[in-house]
Amino acid sequence: MRPLSKYTKPIPAGSLFGLITIYGMIPLTEQLYAFQIVIILNIATLRQSDTVYLLDSSIYIFQAWFGYPDYFHDASGRSVNAVYGYAKTLFSQLRTLNPVYLLAAFDESLFSGFRHELYPDYKANRALPDEELAHQLYLCRRLTELSGVHCVGDSVYEADDWLALGAKVAAAGGLKTAVITRDKDLAQLVRPGDLWWDWAAGKQRDYQALREHWTVLPEEIPDLLALMGDSSDNIPGIAGIGEKSSKALLQHFGNLENLYGDLDSVLGLEMRGVRRLYNALQDTEEEAFLFRELIRLHPPPQHLTLQDMSLEPVSSDRILDFFDQEGLGAAFRNLVTQHYA
């Protein structure tokens, strides 16, 4: 059979019937073969373009920061282990996903966000990045931008909030989302058809799997964590209410409004220690709702479109030039060469 390239010309991306206009140029015996090729190529495109990928970039930078040895340095001797590890992960994600839409969010609001105004002890158990790590965070964001990915983050809203905005835009456009993260807080974004994806662990959970894992609906996770607490964000929860009790309460009441609106009903639950739970919940309504407000995601009041989240054309030479300008050596150049081979 003769190669189809003899008969074809460039076809608009995503056009299922792009070859129809030139079918008259193709022998009848080859038309079916050509049409099958077009269908296969376009189904592959549709698999990618019906999903907006939301990348929690900061979590993978810190994962590389802690996970890679202090072996990689720039020309001035500064450590760049986090940049190397993050670059490997980013290139792997881009190669595997081949996304049409991808939004990368970065945390830039530690100790300056609106949540600290609501609750000064929020994330008080964390430290600001030192100068060396701050430089690596900058390099990682710049690399992501040069890789054609739309990047977001500011000093008021957390990365999670920006990803919530991306999910909102995706839903308005009738698209699914896949949240790439290890952060349990982001599971609250998942709706039927979406995914929560722990990339490093190779673990994907859809809406039902998250519901089974947490025993509450994904959108109820803020209510759950408000009761049981979240030590990673220095949110204490309600004293005397642990994870098991919190899940049992939410399975019955569904949310904080129903729980505190009918608190006397706790005494009638068929579970151990209901009197203790009832006493622990007394006069804690304001606390619980505050904690939920901290855990809930708040999309920034900014304009974002699907077009903004479209992956842009990439020049590997620009990335190589960036590595050269920042004094990053052969190991980094090899990553680019392998990725764009």
What are the language-model segments listed below?
Residues 7, 17, 23, 33-35:
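Aromatic (phenylalanine/tyrosine) cluster motif
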Residues 43-49, 100-103, 149, 193, ...:
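Non-catalytic nucleic-acid-binding/docking modules located in mid-to-C-terminal regions
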Residues 25, 34-45:
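Short, positively charged and aromatic/hydrophobic N-terminal segments
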Residues 43-177, 186-195, 199-203, 289-290, ...:
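Noncatalytic, basic helical substrate-engagement surface that gates or grips nucleic-acid strands
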Residues 2-5:
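Low-acidity, Ser/Thr- and Arg-rich intrinsically disordered low-complexity segments
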Residues 7-10, 43:
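N-terminal cationic leader/targeting segments used for protein routing and processing
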